[in-house]
């Protein structure tokens, strides 16, 4: 079970005047506005860790860090990144994290070449096991999403690790009320600003499972406000042809997790007993071609959203694992300062931004129709009304936005504006186009041709054009 240390994180901090006396700084793994993450080697033991160096600043909320520490120091599970130690100096906090070098979930799927339902089932089984452990210890993650699922090592049989506990919460009487998370993965009760429980994590696992089997999210709309309305309605589809080769057992599993009523939604314990997880109903048919294409299209890499969270210390994948003991990696970086504060990124809105490349289809070839196959557990809602959404800025203040548009989902093609497939209207019998929520896709894989910004279609003056957009939202009650 979890560690039994005192709740006051100050009792856990070790004071230091020079962190380099304890660790050898080897190379940078990543950086954010207030922190940098280094590959370090402990001088006494020779062990390798990821060291997150957080610069003390009036703009950085100590309460957020202490919440993260309070959660991380309580837990110890084979599928959860471990907080090993904490140091503090007059200028920095230092979080010593377990080194995770296997890369992100999506990256590994793209590298496989062959991918089946059974592969997805094994991933979700590990996630359910870890989240079940969190829930048993009174902890709700609240921000489960694919980019928070990393592989421990580059080996093919590596374990999945859950990271990023910045939004985690220790339950008080089993109920919480602060609305937070990532659009597209947030449960309906959170968006409805109702009190919620650990069931929100199970909803997120349902969304992740859906994505792993088709490459795009279950909820996508033209605007954030419409996206939120669709999530609150709890309505989604298993569209053809993307779901034609997926088993009914997998769809049933998803339906039980994407249950609108949190009281009827599967718990982690129930989900672990489902035949798709615990039985032999997950198919071994290769779904790589379709899923990989949709993942590359809908989850483009976005450098301006690459802010490191407490446990997300991976950027060196296979290169790091293969060279850990080579002379070039053992070379110290003694002259590098612990932190070089990066300027806060702003929302890109240049019309000249680069876009995700897409092949041009033969205009004489008709586009495949997307047949609507409603989930048997859902009823079709009326068209969602428009609305405004609250976008949380870096300093915590709120602004109103109604123009942000997620990426569009559908077969790759060139849009009517000539820029990208995101502008393409794909549907059947006048139905609106299908959109997906663009998500951070960190990857050092040179094989993939991802651009630095997520491109979204924006209607202006009767025409559609592309520009960069941000969808990360935290709703604060």
UniProtKB/Swiss-Prot annotation:
Full protein name: Calcium/calmodulin-dependent protein kinase type 1G
Domain notes: The autoinhibitory domain overlaps with the calmodulin binding region and interacts in the inactive folded state with the catalytic domain as a pseudosubstrate.
UniProt KW Protease keyword: no
Region spans: Disordered: 326-388
Gene encoding the protein: Camk1g
PROSITE patterns, per the entry: PROTEIN_KINASE_ATP, PROTEIN_KINASE_DOM, PROTEIN_KINASE_ST
Tissue specificity of this protein: Highly expressed in brain, in neuronal cell bodies of the central nucleus of amygdala and ventromedial hypothalamic nucleus. Also detected in heart, testis, and kidney.
Species of provenance: Mus musculus
Changes after translation: May be prenylated on Cys-474.
């Amino acid at each position: 079970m979890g560690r039994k240390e005192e709740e006051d994180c100050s009792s856990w901090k070790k004071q230091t005047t020079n962190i380099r006396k304890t660790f050898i700084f080897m190379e940078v793994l990543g950086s954010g506005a207030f922190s940098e993450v280094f590959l370090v080697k402990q001088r006494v033991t020779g062990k390798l860790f990821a060291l997150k160096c957080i610069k003390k600043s009036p703009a950085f909320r100590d309460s957020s860090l202490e919440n993260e520490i309070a959660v991380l120091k309580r837990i110890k599970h084979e599928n959860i990144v471990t907080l090993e130690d904490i140091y503090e100096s007059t200028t920095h906090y230092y979080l010593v994290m377990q080194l995770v070098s296997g890369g992100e979930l999506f990256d590994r799927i793209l590298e496989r070449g062959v991918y089946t339902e059974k592969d997805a089932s094994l991933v979700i089984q590990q996630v359910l096991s870890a989240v079940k452990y969190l829930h048993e210890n009174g902890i709700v993650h609240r921000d489960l999403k694919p980019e928070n699922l990393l592989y421990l090592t580059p080996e093919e049989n590596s374990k999945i690790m859950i990271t990023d506990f910045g939004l985690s919460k220790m339950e008080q009487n089993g109920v919480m009320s602060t609305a937070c998370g990532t659009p597209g993965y947030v449960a309906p009760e959170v968006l409805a600003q109702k009190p919620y429980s650990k069931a929100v994590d199970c909803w997120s696992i349902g969304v992740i499972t859906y994505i792993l089997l088709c490459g795009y999210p279950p909820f996508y709309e033209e605007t954030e406000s419409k996206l939120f309305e669709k999530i609150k309605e709890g309505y989604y589809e298993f569209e053809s042809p993307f779901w034609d080769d997926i088993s009914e057992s997998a769809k049933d599993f998803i339906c039980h997790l994407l249950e609108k009523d949190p009281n009827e939604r599967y718990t982690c314990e129930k989900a672990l007993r489902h035949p798709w997880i615990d039985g032999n109903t997950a198919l071994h048919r290769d779904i790589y071609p379709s899923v990989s294409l949709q993942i590359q299209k809908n989850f483009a890499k976005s450098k301006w959203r690459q802010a490191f969270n407490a446990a997300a210390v991976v950027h060196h994948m296979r290169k790091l694992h293969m060279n850990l003991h080579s002379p070039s990696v053992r070379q110290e970086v003694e002259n590098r300062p612990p932190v070089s504060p990066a300027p806060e990124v702003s929302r890109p809105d240049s019309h000249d931004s680069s876009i995700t490349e897409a092949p041009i289809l033969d205009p004489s070839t008709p586009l495949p129709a997307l047949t609507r196959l409603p989930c048997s557990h859902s009823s079709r809602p009326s068209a969602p009304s428009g609305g405004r959404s609250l976008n949380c800025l870096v300093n915590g203040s709120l602004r109103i936005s109604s123009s942000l548009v997620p990426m569009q989902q559908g077969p790759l093609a060139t849009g009517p504006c000539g820029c990208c497939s995101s502008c393409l209207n794909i549907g059947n019998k006048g139905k609106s186009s299908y959109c997906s929520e663009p998500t951070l896709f960190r990857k050092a894989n040179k094989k993939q041709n991802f651009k630095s910004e997520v491109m979204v279609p924006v209607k202006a003056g009767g025409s559609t054009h592309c520009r960069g957009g941000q969808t990360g939202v935290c709703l604060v009650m």
